[in-house]
Amino acid sequence: MSRLKKLYTEEIRKTLQDKFQYENVMQIPVLKKIVISMGLAEAAKDKNLFQSHLEELAVISGQKPLVTRAKNSIAGFKLREGQGIGAKVTLRGIRMYDFMDRFCNIVSPRIRDFRGFSCKGDGRGCYSLGLDDQQIFPEVDLDRVKRSQGMNITWVTTAQTDAECLTLLECMGLRFKKAQ
């Protein structure tokens, strides 16, 4: 069992139960999945660059990314239908908890001038953030990076409100800015 999964079952569930006074244990929020996505529209013109970003995403996440393709052709953007324009990975289970543990304890402190993430969720129990650079992940070989590439990370939970979601993620180790 993952260290973070064990922490969730032994401590975090009790903390959430005490704070939000759930009537049923099934109401306690759970982390369902983590989605990591990259928009690679500029890199789509260069196949080697596109492939290197796919490899970096695979190394970061631990599984092969799914290439997202264009639905329509748009001449103004020089985009053809079926052309690869991005990549995404959906993490569940043990890989999800391992990624969350690494992200909170290793990656977040490596972000320059890091003072915490924004406290704004989507209002339905999900939290998303954007990173400007993939080089903060220790798995990425800096000598092989051809171009800096950002990514979006979304945490999907069973929480009903932002407060529940942010409390769950904060208990798991994600650091947020203090409210002023």
UniProtKB/Swiss-Prot annotation:
It holds the Pfam family Ribosomal_L5. Keywords: Ribonucleoprotein, Ribosomal protein, RNA-binding, rRNA-binding, tRNA-binding. Coiled coil: none annotated. The keyword RNA-binding applies. One of its GO terms (cellular component) is ribosome. GO terms for molecular function: rRNA binding; structural constituent of ribosome; tRNA binding. GO terms for biological process: translation. Belongs to the universal ribosomal protein uL5 family. NCBIfam families: PRK00010.1. Part of the 50S ribosomal subunit; part of the 5S rRNA/L5/L18/L25 subcomplex. Contacts the 5S rRNA and the P site tRNA. Forms a bridge to the 30S subunit in the 70S ribosome. This is one of the proteins that bind and probably mediate the attachment of the 5S RNA into the large ribosomal subunit, where it forms part of the central protuberance. In the 70S ribosome it contacts protein S13 of the 30S subunit (bridge B1b), connecting the 2 subunits; this bridge is implicated in subunit movement. Contacts the P site tRNA; the 5S rRNA and some of its associated proteins might help stabilize positioning of ribosome-bound tRNAs. This is Large ribosomal subunit protein uL5. It comes from Chlamydia muridarum (strain MoPn / Nigg).
